[in-house]
Curated annotation (Swiss-Prot):
Taxonomic source organism: Human immunodeficiency virus type 1 group M subtype B (isolate SC) (HIV-1)
Source lineage: Viruses, Riboviria, Pararnavirae, Artverviricota, Revtraviricetes
Name of the gene encoding the protein in the UniProt record: env
Cysteines joined through disulfide linkages: 53-73, 118-206, 125-197, 130-160, 219-247, 228-239, 296-330, 376-439, 383-412, 598-604
Keywords assigned by UniProt, alphabetized: AIDS, Apoptosis, Clathrin-mediated endocytosis of virus by host, Cleavage on pair of basic residues, Coiled coil, Disulfide bond, Fusion of virus membrane with host endosomal membrane, Fusion of virus membrane with host membrane, Glycoprotein, Host cell membrane, Host endosome, Host membrane, Host-virus interaction, Lipoprotein, Membrane, Palmitate, Signal, Transmembrane, Transmembrane helix, Viral attachment to host cell, Viral envelope protein, Viral immunoevasion, Viral penetration into host cytoplasm, Virion, Virus endocytosis by host, Virus entry into host cell
Protein name: Envelope glycoprotein gp160
Family: Belongs to the HIV-1 env protein family.
PTM text: Highly glycosylated by host. The high number of glycan on the protein is reffered to as 'glycan shield' because it contributes to hide protein sequence from adaptive immune system.
Region described as Fusion peptide: 511-532
Cellular component terms (Gene Ontology): host cell endosome membrane; host cell plasma membrane; membrane; viral envelope; virion membrane
All ranges on the Cytoplasmic side of the membrane: 706-856
Signal sequence, renumbered to the chain: 1-31
Length: 856
């Protein structure tokens, strides 16, 4: 009995422990998180896109056509919006900025496009008979008392004569023109030819074409341009003060070398920027804090003449010079320039360990590299910048080797045949400008190169650094203005875990081969069934949009190839590309939202459970401590997988809804008696009965064949066979003589319909008996389960009452014990306090008693 009781107690404890463990598991189970889609989140990624221009072209001279074609740009925004991005740190790299490459290609394309309709000077590639033009040959001198200072050196200009074929091919006409010495190449003592005739096709700039740099704002649609506002930003690395703009500031496309003109200034101090300061092959871009004014002039009062070189073609040349032939020059304030060099030297010494800084002239090369080249009023100046870069700085004070007065005068030469962008095969002839030419510009930056070499071999002093003016790569000019910008693409779609789940039609998910269908082409599912194709609608929609995009790209390429026929400028192509790309990106996002069942929603819940392998951070940490950019970087590797799961979930949901709608036709009881449904019932019934009869015939034939093989012959169909008794009525034994006569025998029926009737009756009886037995079994099981369940519930209720009573008794006992312990402790404390108090009160008595004993 004791053992049995122990077993029962153990069984009760086991049940109770199992129940408690289940309760603990339910209570401690982690709450399920679900993927939620957000549209419009502030997330971006680095991108390269087509930029277009904005400009105030109408604010400039409308009589001329500027070579930058800014008339095709959109107007600038009178109230540009700039949004400061708080708590954002973004990495910039001015040396890996696609905006620079794009601007460089745009400027080259603009120059090429502006020269396409202009006159080719191929007829001038003939032998020229030239003589040096001297000052004493000038006519109508207006200032005969002027000093020789500033006069052009002898041989700087030449008077050349040449033969030109007239409109009548058999006749040759002799013409003359004045050329600068830099534009002709001597063949012998008196014979010359134009400098680029042997290597390039020279194109004359069209009349009324202006080279004046007009500010161009680069803009992006459906993209964002990030702007770094750090005042000392060196062009690379993280930037903590970031804002977003729709367009850049106005950038003047000034084509110059050595000096950067009319650009932006540094806000606090001079800033040096280089991809690698230790690599002497890398250009150093200097951004000044204060601009230095440079005033340039061509004092010659030139006249121009037109020479016809063919039908509808004219060559514009310098006809004569009124007054003295004076040299072009530029003036710069010596004090301002020295102060600028002083600020640059301070930064260079900080960068190169307080070494002695030496500025020297260019080391040689093409005229564009050796001299400071730029455009002034339509004339291309080539100025000797040796006086600007000829000083040594041992500290904050420098020694200038040139000395002189308060103004630095740079002698300049003029070229009319320009080797465009230092590219082989392209040259331009800039027609001369009438009258005098003057221009004023601001020097806002420098382009420097550092001498290399090994100091141990004596190539240079190890305590000095030599810097020379550089340039030639116009990318550095654009980079000096675009250093603080970068283009990013906006990714408005974001996914994050939440506790919310989409309420959907619950149905078991079918294993349909959608993965294989993902790799089918747009028309690859044409031969599949409609049911299989319905699961690939997502793929088809995506491929359809891709086809539209591809067609648009093909259209753009065709337009770009035929822009000379359509008369589209480079900016027109850029705007078309930018607008189409913006529409494409918007359609792509809307397409994804539609595929996910989130059209028109900013917050869209899904039925995709969140996988902790994507990110195991808690909701509080995600939504309370992380930005969308940080979160996007956290799950960037799983974004495509999450998108795929959302698509599959939505496909299953749509399939479930379709099947639910198909079940709606059974919602009304009257639909059950529809004639169409009854025909369907009859068809199914006939198929079942026919199948059963066929099986009966097959088995009968097989039985006959089997008996024949065993040596029996088939019985007559008129023979009566004894019917089988039930299991509760066994056949009689031999002693029960007359019992067997009572066995009933069934006669084999005649005819096919009779056989069908007997088989159908037997089938119905068999089905009835089996269903009745199954119903009885189910009833017994339900009854048993109900009784056992009721007993279990009563047991759990009694167990709950028992343990609640035990807990109540334990709590009462604990409170009583605590109260008793507190009471006893309180009594002891009070007793101790009383003893201490009495001891203090008896101190005088004890003192008096002690004194009395001492005195006795």
């Amino acid at each position: 009995m004791r053992v049995k009781g122990s077993g029962r107690n153990y069984q009760h404890l086991w049940r109770w422990g199992t129940m408690l463990l289940g309760i603990l598991m339910i209570c401690s189970a982690a709450e399920q998180l679900w993927v939620t889609v957000y549209y419009g989140v502030p997330v971006w990624k680095e991108a390269t896109t087509t930029l277009f221009c904005a400009s105030d072209a109408k604010a400039y001279d409308t009589e001329v056509h500027n070579i930058w074609a800014t008339h095709a740009c959109v107007p600038t925004d009178p109230n540009p919006q700039e949004v400061v991005l708080g708590n954002v740190t973004e990495n910039f790299n001015m040396w890996k900025n696609n905006m620079v490459e794009q601007m460089h290609e745009d400027i080259i394309s603009l120059w090429d496009q502006s020269l396409k309709p202009c006159v080719k000077l191929t007829p001038l590639c003939v032998t020229l008979n030239c003589t040096n033009l001297r000052n004493d040959t000038s006519t109508n001198a207006t200032n005969t008392t002027s000093s020789n200072r500033g006069k052009m050196e002898g041989g700087e200009m030449t008077n050349c004569s040449f033969n030109i074929t007239t409109s009548i091919r058999s006749k040759v006409q002799k013409e003359y023109a004045l050329f600068y010495k830099l534009d002709v190449v001597p063949i012998d003592n008196t014979s010359y030819t134009l400098i680029n005739c042997n290597t390039s096709v020279i194109t004359q700039a069209c009349p009324k074409v202006s080279f004046e740099p007009i500010p161009i704002h680069y803009c992006a649609r459906w993209f964002a341009i990030l702007n770094c506002n750090n005042k000392k930003f060196n062009g690379t690395g993280p930037c903590t003060n970031v804002s977003t703009v729709q367009c850049t500031h106005g950038i003047r496309p000034v084509v110059s070398t050595h000096l950067l003109l009319n650009g932006s200034l540094a806000e606090e101090e001079v800033v040096l920027r280089s991809e690698n300061f230790t690599d002497n092959a890398k250009t150093i871009i200097v951004q000044l804090k204060e601009a230095v004014e440079i005033n340039c002039t061509r004092p010659n009062n030139n006249t121009t003449r037109s020479i016809h070189i063919g039908p509808g073609r004219a060559f514009y040349a310098t006809g004569d010079i009124i007054g003295d032939i004076r040299q072009a020059h530029c003036n710069i304030s010596r004090a301002k320039w020295n102060n600028t060099l002083k600020q640059i030297v301070i930064k260079l010494r900080d960068q190169f360990e307080n070494k002695t800084i030496i500025f020297n002239r260019s080391s040689g090369g093409d005229p564009e590299i050796v001299m400071h080249s730029f455009n002034c009023g339509g004339e291309f100046f080539y100025c000797n910048s040796t006086q600007l870069f000829s000083s040594t700085w041992n500290g904050t004070e420098g020694s200038n080797n040139t000395g002189g007065n308060d103004t630095i005068t740079l002698p300049c030469r003029i070229k009319e045949i320009i080797n465009m962008w230092q590219e082989v095969g392209k040259a331009m002839y800039a027609p001369p400008i009438k009258g005098q030419v003057k221009c004023s510009s601001n020097i806002t930056g420098l382009l420097l190169t550092r001498d290399g070499g090994n100091s141990k071999n004596g190539s240079k002093n190890e305590n000095t650094e030599i810097f020379r003016p550089g340039g030639g790569d116009m990318r550095d000019n654009w980079r000096s203005e675009l250093y603080k910008y970068k283009v990013v693409k906006i990714e408005p779609l974001g996914v994050a875990p939440t506790k919310a789940k989409r309420r959907v039609v619950q149905r078991e998910k079918r294993a349909v081969g959608t993965i294989g269908a993902m790799f089918l082409g747009f028309l690859g599912a044409a031969g599949s069934t409609m049911g299989a194709t319905s699961m690939t609608l997502t793929v088809q929609a995506r491929l359809l949009l891709s086809g539209i995009v591809q067609q648009q790209n093909n259209l753009l390429r065709a337009i770009e190839a035929q822009q000379h026929l359509l008369q589209l400028t480079v900016w027109g192509i850029k705007q078309l590309q930018a607008r189409v790309l913006a529409v494409e990106r918007y359609l792509r996002d809307q397409q994804l939202l539609g595929i996910w069942g989130c059209s028109g929603k900013l917050i869209c819940t899904t039925t995709v459970p969140w996988n902790t392998s994507w990110s195991n951070k808690s909701l509080d940490k995600i939504w309370g401590n992380m930005t969308w950019m940080e979160w996007e970087r956290e799950i960037d590797n799983y974004t495509s997988l999450i998108y795929t799961l959302i698509e599959e979930s939505q496909n299953q949901q749509e399939k479930n809804e379709q099947e639910l709608l198909e079940l709606d036709k059974w919602a009304s009881l009257w639909n059950w008696f529809n004639i169409t449904n009854w025909l369907w019932y009859i068809k199914i019934f006939i198929m079942i009965v026919g199948g059963l009869v066929g099986l009966r015939i097959v088995f009968t034939v097989l039985s006959i064949v089997n008996r024949v093989r065993q040596g029996y012959s088939p019985l007559s169909f008129q023979t009566r066979l004894p019917s089988q008794r039930g299991p509760d009525r066994p056949e009689g034994i031999e002693e029960e003589g007359g019992e067997r006569d009572r066995d009933r025998s069934g006669r084999l029926v005649d005819g096919f319909l009779a056989i069908i009737w007997v088989d159908x009756r037997s089938l119905c009886l068999f089905s009835y008996h089996r269903l009745r037995d199954l119903l009885l079994i189910v009833t017994r099981i339900v009854e048993l389960l109900g009784r056992r369940g009721w007993e279990a519930l009563k047991y759990w209720w009694n167990l709950l009452q028992y343990w609640s009573q035990e807990l109540r008794n334990s709590a009462v006992s604990f409170v009583n014990a605590t109260a008793i312990a507190v009471a006893e402790g309180t009594d002891r404390v009070i007793e101790l306090l009383q003893r201490a108090f009495r001891a203090i009160l008896h101190i005088p008595t004890r003192i008096r008693q002690g004194l009395e004993r001492a005195l006795q």
